[in-house]
Regions:
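Short amphipathic alpha-helical boundary/capping segments
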Residues: 11-20
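Short amphipathic alpha helix immediately N-terminal
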Residues: 22-33
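Short alpha-helical "recognition helix" segments of helix-turn-helix
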Residues: 40-42
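Helix-turn-helix DNA-binding motif, specifically the short coil turn and the N-cap/start of the second
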Residues: 48
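Mid-chain, well-packed structural core segment of small domains
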Residues: 59-92
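Helix-turn-helix/homeodomain-like alpha-helical modules used for DNA recognition
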Residues: 81-124
C-alpha cells in the first residue's frame, strides 16, 4: 500500500471510524495505528490472515462509501487549501503595508475581493 493510500485511509478513519463496527475499528487500529501485521492481528482475534484482510478491505470500502455520501474529508481538505490561500494573500498585503509600498486602492480592493470570494466559496 502506498503512503498516500495510508494517509487517505487514516484521514477517512479519523472522520468516519466511529461509524464502523467494533471489530472493524479494532482491526484498523491495530493495522494502521499499532502497525501490526496481518498475522499478529489474526493471532490476537483467533482468526485467519484472510479474515483480517477481509475485515480491512470491508472497513476501507465502508470508509470510502461514507466519504462518497457525506464528503466531509473533501470539504475539510478544500477548507485547508482555502485557508492557506487566504493566509498567503493577507500576508502579501501586510508585507506591502510594512514596506510602505503604495498600493492603488483598486489593487487592495481586488485582493480583498479575492479573499472574500474564497470565504464565500467555503460557506457553500
Amino acid at each position: 500500500m502506498k503512503i498516500d493510500d495510508v494517509i487517505q485511509t487514516s484521514l477517512l478513519y479519523d472522520f468516519y471510524g466511529s461509524l464502523l463496527t467494533d471489530r472493524q475499528r479494532e482491526v484498523m487500529e491495530l493495522y494502521y495505528g499499532e502497525n501490526l501485521s496481518l498475522s499478529e492481528i489474526a493471532a490476537e482475534f483467533s482468526i485467519s490472515r484472510q479474515g483480517v484482510h477481509d475485515a480491512l478491505k470491508n472497513a476501507g470500502r465502508a470508509l470510502h462509501e461514507y466519504e462518497q455520501k457525506l464528503g466531509l474529508v473533501d470539504k475539510f481538505q478544500q477548507s485547508r487549501e482555502a485557508i492557506g490561500d487566504i493566509d498567503e494573500r493577507i500576508e502579501g498585503l501586510m508585507e506591502d503595508v510594512q514596506k510602505q509600498e503604495a498600493l492603488a486602492p483598486a489593487e487592495v480592493t481586488a485582493e480583498l475581493q479575492k479573499i472574500k470570494d474564497i470565504i464565500d466559496k467555503l460557506e457553500e
